[in-house]
Amino acid sequence: MNTNFVVGGWSSVLWSRLLLCVSLVFAFALPGCEKYDELVAKDQDCQAKWSDYEGELQRRSDLIPGLVETVKGASKFEASTLTQITQARADATSIKLQADDFTDPAKMEAFQKAQDKLSHSSLSRLLIANENYPQLQASARYGELMKQLEATENRVLRARQQYNNAVRGYNTELGKIKGSVVNKATGKPFKPRVYFAATAGSEVAPKVSF
């Protein structure tokens, strides 16, 4: 019996099986890697959209002190209302969300309520001031600041919607079978994010009318 032939035959079989195993590993691993990369990309898109949203919130926050001072100087506007606006601004800017908070409904709701309170409870009072205090209409600075505020509120709403769209795409991929399997296989580094829920009036920015 030719032992070289036997050894050679077994070597060929082993190599064939090894190649088959390697091929199977790549066949399953490659799509998994692609799905993992896709989840990473969508998660980063959510982070980018959130940064855009925070930027618009900061822009709004920066406008408010000037508005308060302008109203205070141009009219005998109720001091208590100006205090409420200032406090609402402080409350809205005091809540800082950490990475884990984006998956916590309670913390996201608290953040949203603080922002909505500033937009639709406090800043709306400044809009009423325009109607009740005609002298404000003669203030060019007040008019310019209010127009900037209206534009900023619209950008805030748009940024919020874009964040929700990014979260929807991310959560959808994470919820698919392949996304779920890859997430479990890699130690569950991805968690579903929380949407901004629509509240009454929050989908419409305060309107400036002169």
Whereabouts are the PLM-identified features?
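A helix-centric hydrophobic-segment signal that preferentially recognizes long
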Residues: F5, S16-L20, A27-F210
